[in-house]
Amino acid sequence: MASAEPLTALSRWYLYAIHGYFCEVMFTAAWEFVVNFNWKFPGVTSVWALFIYGTSILIVERMYLRLRGRCPLLVRCVIYTLWTYLWEFTTGFILRQFNACPWDYSQFDFDFMGLITLEYAVPWFCGALIMEQFIIRNTLRLRFDKDAEPGEPASPPALANGHVKTD
């Protein structure tokens, strides 16, 4: 019998950081295409995005675990969106003190100090929905099997009533 254990917080942080970094690059590439019709799709971000996204999504994971039985999905997504704005403002403000903030929303109509902008409310909300329903929920299902040998196939899935058990 395999002894599978949940991923550590550091392992989950790593997955969240890489996911956020990738999404940031893809979003900036798509934005460049929509705004400037640039077929090169130049996606860019900063290495700071790894820390920012990894930490933020790990905190949202904690929120999800506490709120999932208490709040409807849309309310949770509003809470996550508000958290995203607070986190983006806070990290941006700190990085700006060192001339290291990689974003500037000053050109947007509804920006605050160039660090956050209301124009991103819908993308942040949609991102929060995807983050909870796909990224966090599936990351929490991942397991380390400490008895598995590297390179060997996993043990066959357990059968339930003659069917492969997927949960």
UniProtKB/Swiss-Prot annotation:
Intracellular or extracellular location(s): Membrane
Residue ranges that the Swiss-Prot or TrEMBL entry lists as coiled coil: none
InterPro entries registered for this protein in UniProt: CmpB_TMEM229
Region (Disordered) location: 148-167
Membrane topology: Multi-pass membrane protein
Keyword Transmembrane: yes
Main location: membrane
Cytoplasmic side stretches: 1-14, 62-73, 131-167
Record's keyword terms, sorted: Membrane, Transmembrane, Transmembrane helix
GO BP: macrophage activation; response to bacterium
Segments on the Extracellular side according to the record's topology features: 36-40, 95-109
Cellular compartments per GO CC: membrane
Protein name: Transmembrane protein 229B
UniProt-listed Pfam families: ABC_trans_CmpB (PF06541)
Record-stated family: Belongs to the TMEM229 family.
Membrane-spanning parts: 15-35, 41-61, 74-94, 110-130
